[in-house]
């Protein structure tokens, strides 16, 4: 599959409209953020979310493990000064994985499987102490990404937005596990925006 230019974005030759529609939800998430220093975001996909976030936060750190999406991400937002791009997946600890493309027509419909196409790292590995927003749409891997971010979360108590759509159970953790994990450290659900759940610490 190759990249093509559509509506000013370099994208894999599949539908773009769904991502453009979902990014409009950001306006309902931002009011929960009292500060807007750093946002950690995954998956970066082709850059639509990171670019929009870069207009509101001092620094955007985005992660995208899929090779073709990462190529489009760099082409689309690689020149935006406050966006830091990583060709990595997020998890609980260091490892490696490969991408299983569930639906080739959907550039976000992937899942991680055993392999060595990319590295898996924890957010805590980066040592951030100024994260005000954590936004994760990692196709069922949210639970592991949160486990790998517990130190970071407890340093700055960011607003957390997760896309939870019931597919974490394929990795052994249904959505309830992730919700319970965040509630155990003082977070509550403040809003549900389509499939995104916004958590704020009491």
Language-model-derived ranges and their functions:
Residues 33-40, 100-110, 131-142:
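Mobile, glycine- and charge-enriched loop segments
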Residues 2-26, 81-129:
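Glycine-rich adenosyl-binding loop in Rossmann-like folds that engage adenosine-containing cofactors
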Residues 1-81, 128, 178-181, 188-202:
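S-adenosyl-L-methionine
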Residues 53, 73, 99, 145-149:
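Hydrophobic packing residues within well-ordered alpha-helices of enzyme cores
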Residues 44, 90-92, 138, 164:
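Hydrophobic pocket-lining residues within nucleotide cofactor-binding pockets
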Residues 66-69, 89-93, 166-168:
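Short "lid" loop at the C-terminus of a central beta-strand within the Rossmann-like core
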Residues 78-81, 100-106, 152-153, 176-181:
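Short, hinge-like loop/turn segments at secondary-structure boundaries
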Residues 37, 56-62, 124-202:
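Conserved acidic-Pro-Pro-aromatic motif
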């Amino acid at each position: 599959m190759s990249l093509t230019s559509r509506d000013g974005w370099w994208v894999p030759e599949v539908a773009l409209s769904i991502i453009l529609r979902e990014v409009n939800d950001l306006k309902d998430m931002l009011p929960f953020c009292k500060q807007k220093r750093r946002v950690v975001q995954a998956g970066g996909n082709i850059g639509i979310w990171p670019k929009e976030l870069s207009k509101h936060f001092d620094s955007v750190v985005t992660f995208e493990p899929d090779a073709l999406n990462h190529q489009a991400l760099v082409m689309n937002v690689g020149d935006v000064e406050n966006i830091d791009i990583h060709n990595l997946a997020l998890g609980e600890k260091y490892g490696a994985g490969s991408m299983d493309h569930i639906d080739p027509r959907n550039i976000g419909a992937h899942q991680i499987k055993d392999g060595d196409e990319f590295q898996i790292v924890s957010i805590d590995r980066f040592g951030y102490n100024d994260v005000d927003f954590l936004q994760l749409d990692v196709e069922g891997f949210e639970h592991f990404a949160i486990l790998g971010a517990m130190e970071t979360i407890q340093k700055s108590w960011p607003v957390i937005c997760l896309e939870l759509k019931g597919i974490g159970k394929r990795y052994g953790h249904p959505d309830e596990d992730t919700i319970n994990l965040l509630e155990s450290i003082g977070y509550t659900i403040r809003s549900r925006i389509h499939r995104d759940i916004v958590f704020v610490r009491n």
